[in-house]
Amino acid sequence: MQNESKIAAYIGFAIKSKQAVFGADSIEVYRKKIHLIVISDDLTVKSKENIENIANKRNLEILQLDFSLQDITKRKNCKVLAITNFELAKAIKNNA
């Protein structure tokens, strides 16, 4: 079971410190290091395949949540998020 409140807090820290990238297209063109991709449980199959291809090319980890990212990020239709801070990514993975 995932610790939803802790994961939400760490994602919130990443957003406030501008260490998060939103959306599959933005993740694909982002040039700097990404440490973790977080996907929502309601992501479509085609988008999930696209994210998996990106992750395989760049050797990234994917974490699928049991809940919606929209509730955490307060952004409408947010289903994919990348974390660019190593420590926050590690903390999110440890609480998943």
Regions found by a protein language model. Give the residues of each.
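C-terminal structural segments of small proteins and small subunits
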Residues: 68-96
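Small/polar loops that bind or transfer phosphate-bearing groups
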Residues: 39-40, 84
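Positively charged, polar, low-complexity stretches
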Residues: 16, 24-28, 46-73
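Short, well-ordered secondary-structure micro-motifs within conserved domains or adaptor modules
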Residues: 36-39, 79
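N-terminal first-folded block
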Residues: 6-36
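A residue-level structural signature of the nucleotidyltransferase/glycosyltransferase Rossmann-like core
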Residues: 19, 61, 80-81
